[in-house]
Regions:
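Active-site-flanking segments in enzyme catalytic domains
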Residues: 1-160
Length: 160
């Protein structure tokens, strides 16, 4: 929307390199885009409903917005692409297996990661996607059910 810090764009691009190529190919093929923005995402998309919003995925527009901060670039880029993965595969977070894992492991996940953004299944899916790609050993240790779910799901839909 205005001027953004090039270092944040660099961080976003570095984070995107951690995502399997097959996922990013689908992302691009389906016409999705990622933007670093200096707009207040919380105000622009959520009317100030939340205390802090680092990123958002707008399904209808096929756009992901990342706030113009190093924290947002580091912590929300892969998370937001996780929403794309969830959405692109028919909202995996709404399937029975994930619902069961949500009920059994969400509290453990929130405590282990101090995950303030996890308020529903879709947020948990995106968070688990992020952690699976960046720190799978901790994810497996803390929430093995979510770890194996994500491993099996991603290997079913994508090549690694």
């Amino acid at each position: 929307d205005g001027t953004v810090d090039n270092s944040n764009i660099h961080i976003v691009n570095s984070e995107l390199k951690k995502i399997p190529e097959s996922i990013m190919e689908q992302f691009q093929k389906n016409g999705w885009h990622i933007y670093v923005t200096d707009a207040d995402i919380n105000q622009k998309f959520y009317q100030g409903k939340y205390s802090t919003v680092l990123g958002t995925t707008q399904y209808a527009d096929k756009k992901i917005y990342i706030a113009n901060t190093s924290q947002a670039a580091t912590e929300s880029t892969i998370h937001e692409v996780g929403h794309f993965v969830d959405y692109s595969n028919g909202f995996l977070s709404d399937q029975e297996k994930f619902k069961e894992l949500y009920l059994s492991e969400v509290r453990i996940y929130i405590k282990a990661y101090d995950a303030v953004c996890v308020r529903d299944r879709k947020e948990l899916f995106a968070e688990v996607f992020w952690q699976y790609l960046t720190n799978p050993s901790k994810l497996q240790l803390e929430t093995p059910g979510l770890y194996f779910y994500m491993k099996n799901t991603l290997h079913t839909f994508y090549s690694f």
